[in-house]
């Protein structure tokens, strides 16, 4: 079985001039049509056990724009698994991983690096990065063809700087650069998840905060995953049977 993972499916937005890592809607439709003609796409999750050649389509992060993809799949009698982090559902807040994406998309890495070079908390956080983490996450984003400055910012923030300092730095940057993105427009809400369920889509959990699990104790890993599962099950009134690791690389969860 081939698993194809999606995040951003949208058209170019002039308000996000530096954001290019997305799939155009028409390209998504082309891909679905190709997968259908090739080996076929999973129509029922029970098929997973018996269809080694078919494609399974998955969608991470609970992004509002993914509703478009769900509608396309439903029209074709297909299904996909949508992996939802529960913090935006529960607290109506941006995940740090998406604050990073929004900053890069709106103002670009050049201005970000210029700002961070003058930020005392950022410089202190860089000094306090643990050598074992640098070694553990040496391959982070090595597969990525993004700009080096983008990769540096994402790697430091997502993998190396401690989460408390990271959140504070990102919040300061949102204020400094007057970022006014809407959480409600960015993420799916409970009504959207129930709508996906009606369309025949499957809901899975994607942790609570989308933080690096391999930096947590086993106890906190359990809390992070079980909390997400409980919140989603309570909200959509359906058992959650699927889980997808944030980031997905072995070093991010092992």
Show where each model-derived region lies:
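Catalytic alpha-helical scaffold of carbohydrate-active enzymes acting on polysaccharides/glycoconjugates
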Residues: 1-242, 249-254
């Amino acid at each position: 079985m081939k698993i194809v993972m999606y995040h951003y499916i949208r058209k170019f937005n002039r308000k996000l001039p530096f954001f290019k890592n997305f799939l155009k809607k028409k390209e998504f439709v082309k891909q679905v049509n190709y997968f259908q003609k090739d080996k076929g796409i999973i129509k029922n999750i029970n098929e997973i056990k018996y269809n080694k050649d078919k494609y399974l389509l998955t969608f991470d992060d609970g992004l509002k724009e993914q509703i478009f993809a769900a509608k396309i799949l439903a029209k074709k009698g297909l299904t996909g698994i949508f992996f939802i982090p529960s913090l935006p559902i529960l607290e109506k807040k941006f995940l740090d991983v998406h604050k990073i994406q929004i900053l890069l998309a709106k103002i670009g890495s050049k201005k970000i690096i210029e700002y961070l070079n003058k930020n005392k908390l950022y410089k202190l956080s860089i000094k306090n990065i643990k050598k074992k983490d640098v070694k553990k996450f040496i391959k982070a984003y090595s597969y990525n063809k993004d700009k080096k400055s983008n990769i540096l910012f994402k790697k430091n923030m997502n993998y190396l700087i401690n989460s408390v300092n990271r959140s504070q730095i990102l919040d300061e940057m949102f204020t400094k650069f007057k970022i006014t993105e809407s959480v409600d427009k960015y993420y799916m809400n409970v009504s959207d998840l129930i709508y996906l369920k009606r369309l025949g889509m499957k809901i899975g959990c994607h942790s609570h905060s989308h933080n690096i699990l391999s930096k947590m104790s086993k106890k906190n890993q359990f809390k992070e995953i079980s909390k997400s599962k409980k919140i989603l099950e309570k909200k959509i009134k359906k058992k959650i049977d699927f889980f997808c690791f944030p980031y997905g690389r072995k070093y991010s969860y092992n």
